[in-house]
């Protein structure tokens, strides 16, 4: 079978052997900060990380699902751009006729749109809703697998590829997830 090289590992391949070597491993340490210090430090790390990623010589945008992560990134970016007299472009994505056929479940207990609308109003962003239908998903399915180079969740990967291809027509730099620095 085919196995994936794990994060933090590399392979040494010789004529008759393959050796898996771990070069990095996350180390856990006891958390000793107070609740207040933890909140302060986390807020600083998140805000600092987003601000550093905003450095661009072209307009930026964010993907806004209405969830905690994208809402946090959007709020920070919108606030920083307002200081420069600029308005943040935001994008959200939905499936055609989702409002008609949506069924709540444990993975997605509610539709995204009401939360997106609250964040757009709160942050004062220039927002665009983008949609795709089943044909769009099917057209992008094999491209999504090729891009990922791994098997994937068909609708998620295919829709994200489609979504990104549409957003690039408006903005070429868009943020959605955080990469926090280590201390």
PLM feature spans:
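N-terminal segments that mediate ammonia production and transfer
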Residues: 1-33
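ATP-dependent adenylate-handling active sites, centered on carboxylate activation for C-N bond formation
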Residues: 15, 25-180
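Extended, polar beta-sheet/loop recognition surfaces of beta-rich domains
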Residues: 183
């Amino acid at each position: 079978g085919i196995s994936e090289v794990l994060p933090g590992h590399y392979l040494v391949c010789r004529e008759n052997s393959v050796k898996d070597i771990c070069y990095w491993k996350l180390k856990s340490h006891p958390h000793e900060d107070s609740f207040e210090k933890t909140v302060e430090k986390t807020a600083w790390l998140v805000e600092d990380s987003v601000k550093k990623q905003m450095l661009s010589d072209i307009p930026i945008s964010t993907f806004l699902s209405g969830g905690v992560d994208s809402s946090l990134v959007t709020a920070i970016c919108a606030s920083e751009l307002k200081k420069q007299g600029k308005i943040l472009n935001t994008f959200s994505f939905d499936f055609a006729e989702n409002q008609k056929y949506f069924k709540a479940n444990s993975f997605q207990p509610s539709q995204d749109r009401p939360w997106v609308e609250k964040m757009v109003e709160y942050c004062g962003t220039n927002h665009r809703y983008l949609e795709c239908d089943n044909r769009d998903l099917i057209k992008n399915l094999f491209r999504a697998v090729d891009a990922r180079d791994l098997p994937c969740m068909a609708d998620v990967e295919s829709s994200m590829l489609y979504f990104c291809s549409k957003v690039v027509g408006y903005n070429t730099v868009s943020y959605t997830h955080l990469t926090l620095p280590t201390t």
